[in-house]
Regions:
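Glycine-rich, low-complexity intrinsically disordered segments
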Residues: 1-150
Length: 150
């Protein structure tokens, strides 16, 4: 039987974002068109072995500046929705997920493009994006059905 009072989840960052963005810049975010650095803590650097074989990555990060949440929110493109039907940073578990393009790796420093996160944002995990697992036929994207080539 599930008992939420007994379960505690503790996540530790594996690194952080460096990109010079400190304040929100509107929608669409210009962050996505600028390179960002992900600095991986030295004790995790060996985990980057063979990561450069992947063109795209999924970055899981913490919305560390978000304070509180509402179960319904107004989104810029989709109107009012439940928080789980949105990309809002104001969530019960403040985790973000973005697919980014890997531009380069130098020691423990990744350069990526497409990361919509502030400078100093804690990175919780990095995973290779694998298209055959990421694409789904008939998935709705921004309210429209798109067909996958996978």
């Amino acid at each position: 039987m599930y008992n939420s009072k007994r379960i505690k989840i503790a996540l530790s960052p594996i690194g952080f974002v460096r990109n010079g963005f400190y304040v929100p810049c509107g929608e669409p975010s210009p962050f996505r068109n600028k390179p960002s650095k992900i600095i991986v803590f030295p004790k995790y650097a060996a985990g980057l072995y063979r990561l450069k074989e992947h063109k795209y990555l999924d970055i899981i990060f913490c919305f560390h500046r978000s304070k509180g949440y509402k179960l319904r929110c107004k989104t810029p493109h989709w109107g009012v929705r439940g928080v789980f039907a949105s990309r809002s940073p104001y969530r019960p578990s403040p985790l973000g997920l973005m697919k980014v393009r890997l531009l380069s790796i130098r020691k423990n420093e990744l350069t990526v493009k497409g990361l919509d996160a502030f400078d100093g944002t804690p990175v919780v995990d990095i995973k290779p994006y694998v298209a055959k697992w990421g694409r789904k036929k008939g998935v709705k994207h921004h309210g429209k059905t798109k067909r996958s080539k996978a």
